[in-house]
Amino acid sequence: MPPKFWIIIIVKKIDQQSLENAYRLFESGDIHQIEIGSTKGLQQIHHYLFNGLYEFAGKIREQNISKGHFRFANALYLKEALGKIEQMPEDTFENIINKYVEMNIAHPFLEGNGRSTRIWLDLVLKKHLGKVVNWQNVDKTQYLQAMERSPINDLEIRFLLQANLTDDVNNREIIFKGIEQSYYYEGYEKE
């Protein structure tokens, strides 16, 4: 078998284990120990999802990264940028989405940013608005395109997510289907 095949198998196993960790984060109640809206809280989520899978689990990256033609925040200024993002207000839906978009631009980890940040976003929305995103209703292509355009204009991602808010914040099915959808956005599909 070619080496590429083995890489695909390894990545799929990492995603599968990380997904199980995400389920456990909620089922165990450990989600209630996460610091909401902070960089530390995002690091806690990332560590929980990827501990034992990546040596950098929960650690702020120290190298530059990009996806496609987009370069995320420069590693030299990342901690300063994260400090500014942390201070952003969380009093309205618009402000929360603005903070979410800025955290996505920062992309503090080498891998696993989207999965971690979507959980982080839901915690902020739940705390301040009593709502979460019903991710299972958010189309993958529309979401990824809106996020790609969000550094220029966050209106599209705001409308997309606002149309899929629910106040059923403790519904187990919404939570777990949302986690699965989050992994699907990143290319993982359960067998």
Swiss-Prot record:
One Pfam family, short name: Fic
Family annotation (SUPFAM superfamilies): Fic-like
Enzyme class: transferase
Protein's UniProt keywords contain Nucleotidyltransferase: yes
PROSITE patterns, per database record: FIDO
A biological process term (GO) from this entry: regulation of cell division
EC number: 2.7.7.108
Residue ranges of every copy of the Fido domain listed in the record: 37-162
Catalytic activity: L-tyrosyl-[protein] + ATP = O-(5'-adenylyl)-L-tyrosyl-[protein] + diphosphate; L-threonyl-[protein] + ATP = 3-O-(5'-adenylyl)-L-threonyl-[protein] + diphosphate
UniProt keyword Nucleotide-binding present: yes
Domain of life, per lineage: Bacteria
Homology family: Belongs to the fic family.
Name of this chain's protein: Probable protein adenylyltransferase HI_0977
Species name: Haemophilus influenzae (strain ATCC 51907 / DSM 11121 / KW20 / Rd)
